[in-house]
């Protein structure tokens, strides 16, 4: 019995692919002073937002990843992925409680992303979250009706109930829904489609 086999000869060349994220300013050590100034601006904007802000933390990170992709059809391509991100954290205290706010804008871009970013607005956003949280009252507890919007609600439902409805868990009797066919397992107000 003869088996037919196909062998693909590698192309031995790297193909160029269109750059989806052109980099205007490649991140390197020459931008240290500019980055320090950007972080100082974020710190000042967050710190001055409200007297409850007692601490801030700001960081900038850049990563450059060189990727080589090859497949059995002889395709060989390379890609360079440059990512830039600013992380802004603010802590608010009221003497008894402590809350934090965070903002972390980033993009597949070079340092130009930071130059085009409204740093002060992002810093104030992080501070606003912390300040609002530290001044907020406690959420009501107990049984409450919940309405979940379409979209992300599906993810919430899956995490809350979906894993328990997976066939292997039900078949092995390890699911809370095992042996519940025909029985009510949630509020009569719950409808999952």
Residue ranges of each PLM-predicted region?
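Active-site bordering "gate/hinge" segments
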Residues: 1-193
